[in-house]
Regions:
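Short, glycine-rich, amphipathic interfacial segments at transmembrane boundaries or analogous
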Residues: 42-78, 136-154
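A hydrophobic, helix-centered structural microdomain
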Residues: 1-64, 171-222
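Positions in alpha-helical segments
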Residues: 14, 42, 80-84, 116, ...
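Short, solvent-exposed loop/helix junctions and linker helices
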Residues: 2-5, 21, 76, 87-91, ...
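A short, structured surface patch at a secondary-structure boundary
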Residues: 75-132, 172-175
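Glycine-rich flexible loop motifs, especially short His-Gly-Gly/GGXG/HXGH segments used as catalytic or interaction
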Residues: 1-14, 43-44, 68, 144-165
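Short, hydrophobic secondary-structure boundary micro-motifs
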Residues: 28, 42-43, 70-71, 108-110, ...
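Cytosol-/stroma-facing membrane-proximal "stalk/adaptor" domains immediately downstream
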Residues: 128, 138-187
Length: 222
């Protein structure tokens, strides 16, 4: 029964949000266009319910600057002053309300991450896709980008198992407080969260590093 109620809340909430914030949306779009040009909206394929892909919308926060070899510069160098403000205030997320109206996302749920992460989850972590992704979620009010991927996914799965009207109301209320306080926006010393490599890739990297260290020690002995 709650999924039906949740969808009604999503439609009403996203619709009201777009109406209330329409002057902000228009104003920010103009500012981004003046500073960075087109496109104003950043569109990227993300996995949704049961891993099905959809295009997620956000306000653009970075330039497309590249080095002499045509390779994109690091995120920290491409993130503009306006982009930093949009991220710290979470205003870059406002266009996701269109995704909520379309039914790709919910107001509350695990955040939609990158498509390549689907192959890197453990079976337990993959359970985060048993519900629609959200504009905000349980992990976002419990550390956001200052906690590890493993902690974040554990919180996502906990939400899947405990989703309810009152929990969603609590998350929305706490999100408003966190946004006002600007907590947990990014990991220390980084413009964006480090890429999730997955448990098995991490284990392989550790083994590879151990092999290299062992080989180096053998060379020293020889």
């Amino acid at each position: 029964m709650y999924p039906v109620i949740k969808r009604c809340i999503d439609v009403v909430g996203a619709g009201l949000g777009l109406v209330v914030f329409s002057p902000v949306l228009i104003g920010l779009a103009i500012m981004i266009w003046i500073q960075m040009g087109r496109p104003v909206i950043f569109k990227q394929m993300r996995p949704g319910l049961q891993g099905r892909s959809f295009f997620m919308y956000k306000f653009r926060t970075m330039t497309d600057e590249r080095d002499e070899n045509g390779v994109l510069l690091p995120d920290e160098m491409r993130l503009t002053r306006l982009g930093k403000f949009l991220r710290s205030s979470s205003l870059d997320e406002l266009p996701e309300l269109f995704n909520v109206l379309k039914g790709d996302m919910s107001l509350v749920g695990p955040r939609p991450l990158l498509m390549q992460y689907l192959q890197r989850y453990t079976p337990e972590q993959a359970r985060r896709h048993e519900v629609k992704p959200g504009v905000t979620g349980w992990a976002q009010i419990n550390g956001r980008n200052t906690i590890s991927w493993e902690e974040k996914f554990a919180l996502d799965v906990w939400y899947v198992d405990n989703c309810s009207l009152w929990l969603d109301v609590k998350i929305l209320f706490m999100t408003a407080i966190k946004v006002f306080q600007r907590e947990g926006i990014s990991a220390e010393g980084a413009a964006t969260m480090q890429e999730f490599m997955g448990y098995y890739e991490k284990q392989y990297s550790k083994l590879h590093l151990n092999d290299l260290q062992a080989a180096a020690m053998q060379d020293d002995v020889d």
